[in-house]
Amino acid sequence: ATLRALIKVTENIGNECYLGKEDTEAILEKTEKDIFGLLQNRNRMSDFVPIQQIVLNSLSAIEEASKTKGRVTGVATGFTELDYKLTGLHPAELILVAARPAMGKTAFVLNIAQYAAFKDNHAVAMFSLEMSKEQLVTRLMASESMVDSQQMRTGDLRDSDWEKLLEGAALIGNSKLIIDDTATTLAEIRSKCRKYKQTYGIELVVIDYLQLMTGSESRRNE
């Protein structure tokens, strides 16, 4: 069955290449998505869930919520009030953080990724389209070690500061945080998310920030 499905995928991709209606990037993304689905032993029919089962799943979720009474059931953000309202971050949720420029959006999402990866040991992928991975790690080290970032930039550090920095560096280095500053398009981010999920089992994806993402001409609106 898997071989037949693979043959069907390759036939469809070949036809799309000959038709030339989609650009190369879109075809590559679709190819990867279809083959990844085969690797996960999934296909369109097995993804179908009867409405009755969906209703039961929803009722079970509501029943579980009534038992937990607002306790965090997803990935905690570290912000008490936010966790109470959301009960954590859950699979398939898309949450947008919106604010005026220079209001601390990057710092906010970085704190969430930091808490999830360092405090709760979740696998987190953070895509940074503005800051380099080195810049982000430097900010994380300043936060975790409680050493002034300006002192880190100038190198004006005491022995005690170095001890704190090394402790912070060890915590970050042993975590499941993935920082990627190379993906710039929607297709690249999707592709890497699939790979990171398969390889590292990521539970949270953070993108900073959406306006800097680019897309292929045929999928720019998406």
Q: What would you call each of these model-derived segments?
A:
Residues 79, 87-131, 185-197, 203-206, ...:
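P-loop NTPase nucleotide-binding module
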Residues 1-68, 92, 98, 102-103, ...:
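Short, small/acidic-rich helices and loops at N termini and domain boundaries
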Residues 2-9, 13, 20-27, 31-34, ...:
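Helical mechanochemical/support elements of P-loop NTPase systems and associated helical scaffolds
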Residues 115-201, 215:
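Cytosolic-facing regulatory segments adjacent to core modules
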Residues 215-221:
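Short acidic, glycine/proline-rich loop/turn micro-motifs
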Residues 64, 68-89:
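P-loop NTPase nucleotide-binding/switch module
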Residues 212:
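Residues immediately C-terminal
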Residues 209:
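Walker B catalytic acidic pair
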